[in-house]
């Protein structure tokens, strides 16, 4: 593992200790280049979440049961292209869209550290809220108006592999996966650790 990642996860203190501190104030809140530079750096907890999510997906893909599924998919008609598109959407969704949105939430709606009890309650509330939001968005995606945004995900209906979990269109990822977290954070104002734990549990 590279030294920047080690520094992000360990550094002079543990990553847990980092999440247990207040969200640092952005040095230049009005600068878009500075915002995106931080969003795509390991100073952003969302970038760490991105790396962990992709790493876990890769590990799951390497399990014996998953490998056989991938082989079956690659042997099917159009399978190699579909799998490549699924991998691409995983990187676009988790690695391109995710970090800036996470950084925005942390800058705007994250509270100072909570007590342990409040954190448990907050994680539960965020997960429940996200589940409701995802359910409503998913129902909407199955209407004639929005099915175009959901169609790609259903191309994995014969062979389901771990990468298919986040193999959704950019529009679906924004509306069904991310928007419920953004709205939940804006309404509930979680602390840094609660947000990270809720997102981690929900995407796992």
Label every PLM stretch briefly.
Residues 1-193:
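Non-catalytic, topology-defining segments of multipass membrane proteins
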Residues 189-204:
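Functionally important transmembrane alpha-helices
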